[in-house]
Amino acid sequence: MNKIMLCLLVCGVVHAATYDLLKAPNYFEDFLHKFNKNYSSESEKLHRFKIFQHNLEEIINKNQNDSTAQYEINKFSDLSKEEAISKYTGLSLPHQTQNFCEVVILDRPPDRGPLEFDWRQFNKVTSVKNQGVCGACWAFATLGSLESQFAIKYNRLINLSEQQFIDCDRVNAGCDGGLLHTAFESAMEMGGVQMESDYPYETANGQCRINPNRFVVGVRSCRRYIVMFEEKLKDLLRAVGPIPVAIDASDIVNYRRGIMRQCANHGLNHAVLLVGYAVENNIPYWILKNTWGTDWGEDGYFRVQQNINACGIRNELVSSAEIY
């Protein structure tokens, strides 16, 4: 990219990220129209405006303090951070675990691999999905990994059924939350996974309607990795395919674009899919696929700086599975 194009891009980002807190009422009216928001009463509307105003102030502060990322008013801007996390994430501890997954310690220094790698460039990542108001990020991230495993093995992209996991996983809690490795274990216990078209997503818990005759993917085994060096995730990503990871989503809610260099690490509450890594302006970063639709972030993806444990990406063991 030449200097003129780079300048235009950067200038465009800065301009798009400029907000004036005094114009909050105008932004709020635009927000209501753009996202078709309706409230039950004037008091509820006032309550939502106050939250919106608080979020706008945070967006302005982030845009001033994080020069490599941009934050914006989006569909979540009338929700408190706590509301957004409770409605649109879903990583939580189940009451029991199966312990089928082998635990592997990755304590050797990272290999000298390529500076950049992205599974999307090999057409091994399915399209971005939208979990909606259902705490099933754990199912989406897990199945996103299995979808990529299938594409790597059979050179074909398929969409697997999150609803099957929501309804039929006896360890995790459907839209009320779950964990990544227990989802792999449940896939082994269920015997396979159906297509999304056979068992469509409903954004709610339902009765299990599993049909073993319609299974298209089975999980033979799973592993949990203790990663001693964050850089080691690169080797693992290249070796096993896209990896579901647990993060703290508190600071990504109003993300628009760019490389996040400041991301909270206070508690893991969301699951996303690590699909690649690269370097931009000497900043190494991870590429992560979210499940909040393509109208969020960079067409549904976001980027965070490497080697600072951004969003707590290294706090939890990462998991992978072998399919058949």
Curated annotation (Swiss-Prot):
One matching Pfam family: Peptidase_C1
Keyword Manganese among UniProt keywords: no
Assigned keywords, A-Z: Disulfide bond, Glycoprotein, Hydrolase, Protease, Signal, Thiol protease, Zymogen
Catalytic residues (UniProt): 137, 270, 290
Signal peptide: 1-16
Positions annotated as glycosylated: 159
GO molecular function, one term: cysteine-type peptidase activity
Swiss-Prot/TrEMBL catalytic activity: Endopeptidase of broad specificity, hydrolyzing substrates of both cathepsin L and cathepsin B
Propeptide residues per the UniProt entry: 17-113
Annotated GO biological process: proteolysis
EC number(s) reported in the record: 3.4.22.50
Disulfide bonds: 134-175, 168-208, 263-311
Maturation and modification: Synthesized as an inactive proenzyme and activated by proteolytic removal of the inhibitory propeptide.
CDD domains reported in the protein's UniProt record: Peptidase_C1A
Enzyme class: hydrolase
Listed InterPro entries: Papain-like_cys_pep_sf, Pept_asp_AS, Pept_cys_AS, Pept_his_AS, Peptidase_C1A, Peptidase_C1A_C, Peptidase_C1A_papain-like, Prot_inhib_I29
Function recorded in the entry: Cysteine protease that plays an essential role in host liquefaction to facilitate horizontal transmission of the virus. May participate in the degradation of foreign protein expressed by the baculovirus system.
Record-stated family: Belongs to the peptidase C1 family.
Name of the featured protein: Viral cathepsin
Organism the protein comes from: Orgyia pseudotsugata multicapsid polyhedrosis virus (OpMNPV)
Gene: VCATH
